[in-house]
Amino acid sequence: MKQQYLLDYEATKASKNGMPVCKFDSCIPALQFCKENGIKMRGHVLVWHNQTPEWFFHKDYDVSKPLVDAATMERRLESYIKQVIEFCQKNYPGVVYCWDVVNEAILDDGSWREINNNWYTIMKEKYVEKAFYYARKYAKKDVALFYNDYNVFLPAKREAIYNLAQKLKEKGLIDGLGLQPTVGLNYPELDSDDIDSFKTTLETFAKLGLQIHITELNFEIKGDESNRTPENLKKQADRYYEMMKLLLKEDTDNGGPCNITCVTVFGICDDYPLYKNFKQCMYLWDKNCNPKPCFYSFLQAGLDWKASLLSK
């Protein structure tokens, strides 16, 4: 549910009130499936610098014309968020249980993402708070609002996200943080002896008293299929095991400090292209939908944790 797929260019250009017009054909099948099968869906994402049409930011929605001013952009922002949230709530009540309101607004050095980000160019950092403000305004009270980002284990980025979330929490605009452990087998080195960076991140964000969602969890074996050796597949399985063991240990349900209410893997099967010509080996099932070693290690972490509790 990204702007690239929901914004209707022709209808928006013809809009009498100058506000954007959405079409929901691309997301209706998934929403309908979830509704019919009692499945909850994460709404991803209301505001992102990526996959938002360039024309959305320009006067008269014409890329040959200048960017609009901040006031106009804010009106477009509100209109878009209102349309998307209200469409889901009216037609699929109770299906979308949370929204990633803003995605990846902070760089690894802790600064705002300014380059190739028209939201920032026009509205500066105010666009983040405004997005949460309007999401809170139109979302039902039981729908949780999240800020979502990757590389959260980096100290400067971790601090910047913490400060942003604290500010939003003080204004009652945020319910949780989505943390994307989208990493390779060796970045960061998440083995049993060296997972302090992510552990520190979890415990730092726990101090905010917000929900923590693990989003886009994956450990990628980079390169072509020749790299998918038994050794690397085992290493991948070990990474999943260690991460799940850490999350179980840190969760408040198990006596830890972190209110971890969701763990989501990034996808289902290897080589199912997220982007065109972009194949990946990072998921729990292979390209033929057969469970990989990491599928079993993912489950084993939970079984081992349960066994350790029963033995006490």
UniProtKB/Swiss-Prot annotation:
GO MF annotations, alphabetized: endo-1,4-beta-xylanase activity
Gene3D superfamilies listed in its UniProt record: Glycosidases (3.20.20.80)
Swiss-Prot/TrEMBL keywords: Carbohydrate metabolism, Glycosidase, Hydrolase, Polysaccharide degradation, Xylan degradation
Alphabetical list of SUPFAM superfamilies matching this protein: (Trans)glycosidases
UniProt function note: Could be a xylanase.
Family designation: Belongs to the glycosyl hydrolase 10 (cellulase F) family.
Protein name: Putative endo-1,4-beta-xylanase
Organism expressing this protein natively: Caldicellulosiruptor saccharolyticus (Caldocellum saccharolyticum)
Species classification: Bacteria, Bacillati, Bacillota, Bacillota incertae sedis, Caldicellulosiruptorales
